[in-house]
Amino acid sequence: MSVLRAPGIYARDRLPLERLRAGTPALAPDDDVFTNHIHADDLARLCLAALWRGRGARVYNAVDDTEMKMGEYFDAVAEAFALPRPPRLPRAQLQATVSPAMYSFMTESRRLRNARVKRELRLKLLYPEVRDALRRFAGQSQRE
């Protein structure tokens, strides 16, 4: 049995667009935290790869190749969809502005690597970088 650690699942219909439209703030760059992402389609493919090729008692980080801070992610989504970037606030001010659950989410920092996924499961991601996926999604929105 393998364990998949999958933070930050996104897809075309799982983006923080409403959050950006609402103007929900993000951490100031000096306080910003690292975050990890995986496209839902890549996660599904990774589940199958782990089922068929995963080694027993292994933990696989189900993340893409993007190294990005959370505020940078929100900025990239805003840029791709021509939305305003979120205001950036220092930690103390952000804590006074958002709910405790949102604050907890926005201050958790993770930096996971997917080398084991690539090496052992031999999975080539369809969406290796968040920015590439966002450009594709934005192009689809313009055609709709």
Where are the language model's segments positioned?
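Amphipathic terminal alpha-helices
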Residues: 128-144
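Glycine/proline-rich active-site loop of Rossmann-fold NAD(P)-dependent oxidoreductases
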Residues: 8-23, 28, 49-60, 66
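Mid/C-terminal beta-alpha module of Rossmann-like enzyme folds, strongest
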Residues: 44-102
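Glycine-rich "substrate-gating" loop/helix at the edge of Rossmann-like oxidoreductase active sites
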Residues: 7-9, 30-40
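Conserved C-terminal active-site "lid" loop/helix of NAD(P)H-dependent oxidoreductases
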Residues: 95-124
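Short, glycine/charged-enriched secondary-structure capping and boundary segments
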Residues: 16-21, 75-77, 126-127
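Residue-level signal for the nucleotide or nucleotide-sugar donor/cofactor binding architecture
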Residues: 38, 68, 112, 128
